[in-house]
Amino acid sequence: MTAPHTPSRRDETLGLWLGVLGVAIFAITLPATRLATGSAQAPQLSPWFVTVGRAALAGLLSAAFLLATRSPRPQQAQWKHLGWAVLGNVIGYPLLLGYALRSVTASHAAVVTALLPLVTAAVAALVLHQRARLGFWACAVLGSVLVVAFSLLRGGQQGHGFGFETADLLLVGAVVAASVGYIHGARVTPALGAERVICWMCLMALPFTLPAALWLWPAQPVAPSAWAGFVYVGVFSMWAGFFAWFRGLALGGALRVSQTQLLQPFFSILASIPLLGEPLDVVTLGFAAAVVATVVVGKKLS
């Protein structure tokens, strides 16, 4: 009888750094998407084009990877979960995020999307009928209250009155969409392998995303910075980042490496300073830290 494999110290260290790399890649998604779509005052690429275009780019890369590795096709029962993952992660999250980032800063979005790990756990509890402790739900409610308070505060500061911005509702929708996609993707990961799940998702969507991207190709000139943001979210956010992230989880252990997700909102805020010229806002940092704290405590109580 062989002993179960345990990661070596070297694997744990490499896995941790790969996890940090993956989180950093995902964190830059917010400012890169803002670069690609522009603002309401100076729009660049349409959110629909960015959504289908980034997925098409990742789909072409995925096709090459799956062919090169001679990956077997998913079984019939697995396509349903891949389809839900496509709707949540390939279409829903980037589309809602793209529209939201035309109205709010990337730093603002980082605070709202910091709830993603907690919402994912809540969706898992509801969809997979997993029981969670009362303390977990208390943290989920507290984290949601913090996000609501932040959104109301920002609305008042911008002269819109104390009420939700449409962008805040879009961001919440994006978080829910991503969470649903993550849960369904996770259900087929043990059988397919983590890297292949994202590849099959992108390839599954390619018959729709590639023609749609060509149809929606911008007719007007677009700033080079917008194209740079688009290429980033297609190559890195939608594809390469998952390779670093999943490999890090495998090498360093999912429990340990997944904690690096807590750095993501801070990486997003910091990346927005040089990429978008957004100021370092103490209030935004404070709310981000508070939301992350609810995620930390919530995970311990789940």
What are the functions of these language-model segments?
Residues 1-52, 158-187, 208:
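Glycine-/small-residue-enriched transmembrane alpha-helix faces in small-molecule transporters
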Residues 62, 123, 132-154, 271, ...:
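Hydrophobic transmembrane alpha-helices of multi-pass small-molecule transport proteins
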Residues 16-19, 77-86, 132-144, 192-201, ...:
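Cytoplasmic-side transmembrane-helix entry/capping segments in multi-pass membrane proteins
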Residues 31-44, 102, 151-164, 213-230, ...:
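Membrane-interface helix termini and inter-helical loops of multi-pass transporters
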Residues 42-92, 119-123, 142, 176-184, ...:
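Transmembrane alpha-helices of multi-pass small-molecule transport proteins
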Residues 25-30, 66-113, 149, 234-252:
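Specific transmembrane alpha-helical segments of multi-pass solute transporters/efflux pumps
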